[in-house]
Amino acid sequence: MARVTVEDCVDKVENRFELVLLAGHRARQISQGAPITVDRDNDKNPVVALREIADETLSPDDLKEDLIHSLQKHVEVDEPEAAPAQIANAAEEIAEGIAEAGEEDVVTFDRMSEEELLAGIEGLVAPEKNDGF
């Protein structure tokens, strides 16, 4: 990798670590068949990616955004937020629904004393040992 190329890129992308991430991402894009925007001149993909960044044929901000999207497992979709009045109305409807449900939907849990718990634990059988695990 030519030092001149790296020095030219540092002017465009201040952080060297970010530069490495962006150039690596762009080099992977090139290896997957993305069209290059500069002459190859028998250079390898990372050098071509750095030359593209140095020549500003690609925007570092666009590359950064594309890198972020490629690393996300779940891409968020910006949806318009509900107005505060709609949220208040929905909260009131939920509260009314809970009040109407009343005592019928109350969930009860069985209680167990400490002695009953210990007796239950003592009654458990240990699993057989297996050589595979």
UniProtKB/Swiss-Prot annotation:
Reported function: Promotes RNA polymerase assembly. Latches the N- and C-terminal regions of the beta' subunit thereby facilitating its interaction with the beta and alpha subunits.
Listed GO MF terms: DNA binding; DNA-directed RNA polymerase activity
Domain of life, per lineage: Bacteria
Alphabetized UniProt keyword annotations: DNA-directed RNA polymerase, Nucleotidyltransferase, Transcription, Transferase
Transmembrane segments: none
NCBIfam families: rpoZ
Catalytically driven reaction(s): RNA(n) + a ribonucleoside 5'-triphosphate = RNA(n+1) + diphosphate
SUPFAM superfamilies from the UniProt entry: RPB6/omega subunit-like
GO terms under cellular component: DNA-directed RNA polymerase complex
InterPro entries: DNA-dir_RNA_pol_omega (IPR003716), Pol_omega/Rpo6/RPB6 (IPR006110), RPB6/omega-like_sf (IPR036161)
EC number from the UniProt entry: 2.7.7.6
Subunit composition and interactions: The RNAP catalytic core consists of 2 alpha, 1 beta, 1 beta' and 1 omega subunit. When a sigma factor is associated with the core the holoenzyme is formed, which can initiate transcription.
UniProt family annotation: Belongs to the RNA polymerase subunit omega family.
GO biological process assignments: DNA-templated transcription
HAMAP family: RNApol_bact_RpoZ
Cited Pfam families: RNA_pol_Rpb6
Protein known as: DNA-directed RNA polymerase subunit omega
